[in-house]
Amino acid sequence: MATGVSGIPSLPDIPMLRNFRGTILHSSQYEDGEAWRDKKALVIGSGNSGHDIAQDLHSSGANVTLVQRSSTLIVNVEPSAQLPYALYDEGPSLTDCDLIATSIPLPLARKSHILLTEQAKNLDKDLLDGLRRVGFKLDFGEDGTGWQFKYLTRGGGYYFNVGCSDLIVKEEIGLVQFSDIAAFVAEGARMRTGETLAADLIVLATGYKGQEHLVRELFGNDVADRVGPIWGFGDGQELRNMFTRTAQPGLWFIAGSFAQCRIYSKYLGLQIKACELGLLPQARTGSHASRTAEQGQVDRAKTAALRKASASHTFLEPR
């Protein structure tokens, strides 16, 4: 399955929302802001989708307010968000960069990303200070590890600023905290101050459920329970059920950035070849949270499969 890190829209249970008489959309249903010119919109959620939709509505002439549910990591898309990829501009080949990036042990990678996040905060200081002034709640990931570790652990919780944050700082896009909303009413959101924030449209930019929910929907409870959680780090400090065998024979997962998929697709292919050659069991056994105990067997099988397949010209060796 190459369906991405996220799949099924996550719809929060907000009983009061049924009181609203306007239009309610999940971000996955949003298409264009033109229909909402001169209308009032509330966008609930402050991740990438929420910011992008708020900016699109604003550019289409809507009066927009962003509703922040929890603290969010904000980083300018240039240059700050690109800091983790600086190696790719320093001379090594693309293949070597991918290998270096994926071979760093997790504890060392965490320390590296803490330093990169501090560097990004310094680069984005003016923007971040401006967001704080208007009441935007910021965070920088667990232990300050930044956006990449948010992506690897939960697949969201950050925004690459391409202009929406600047509009919020300039108060061209409004900002309220979800905790300041007392109730949703027919006309919009009633604040705890007694004021009613009128709206014609409410967009739920509330994210997506993980791949395990899509597996349950497509293949049923037995397969989903057998496979377990997908993405996020397991006990073996690797992404769970990603680029490797799962407990369900024949079911494989690949997702992530080009940098991840370029190199891990080769390793995934080697494992499939090893299974086809009988060098590796078709399914992984044991806890879905960890594959540490089998890692040596997997590594040996990868090497053996590569040698055998390359010798018979039945598999393209990674370049």
Residue map of PLM features:
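Flavin (primarily FAD) cofactor-binding/catalytic cores of flavoenzymes
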Residues: M1-L42, S46-N48, Q55, S59-S70, ...
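A catalytic-pocket lid/entrance helix-loop region that shapes and gates access to the active site
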Residues: L73-A109
